[in-house]
Amino acid sequence: MHVRQTIREAVATILATTPTNWASVLQTRIATTRQVWPFLMVYAVDEATEQLLIHPTGIYDRTATIHVVGMLKVPGTGDGSGNMETVEDRMDALSAEVETKLTNATLKAVVAKTQSLALQSTSMEIVLNDEDGSISHAAVTQAWVVTYATAEGLPETLI
């Protein structure tokens, strides 16, 4: 399997550990219509590569962007919250939990040869019952940058 998949699986494993508030952590950007809320999605969006010319065997430095997307029902729309907190509070709590769990050290504990992991950005949006009948929800997207290296022709092996 490609190293991106290894990293994506490691991130999902870390986020699924207790304590957790998530019904599930999906390794895809497409949730099923029967998904139990709240949930997280983990997927790679891009990967930049640079060949290091100082190595005769061909080494690629890679930088992948992994998105962690938290999906939450808007309070008061059947989420059982009783409107005790605002959607902003819930989005901030989600962000804090992900940032607390997902660190360079926790990733290296699962995938030892990664070079670094850093939070690049966080975006938040709210979708209120749009025309297609979807659930009113909030989405928090965190972009994480992971750097690592592979040998030329061996994208399945970290070095």
Model region roles, listed by residue range:
Residues 1-34, 47-159:
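Charged, amphipathic alpha-helical segments and their flanking helix caps
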Residues 35-44:
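Short, well-ordered secondary-structure micro-motifs within conserved domains or adaptor modules
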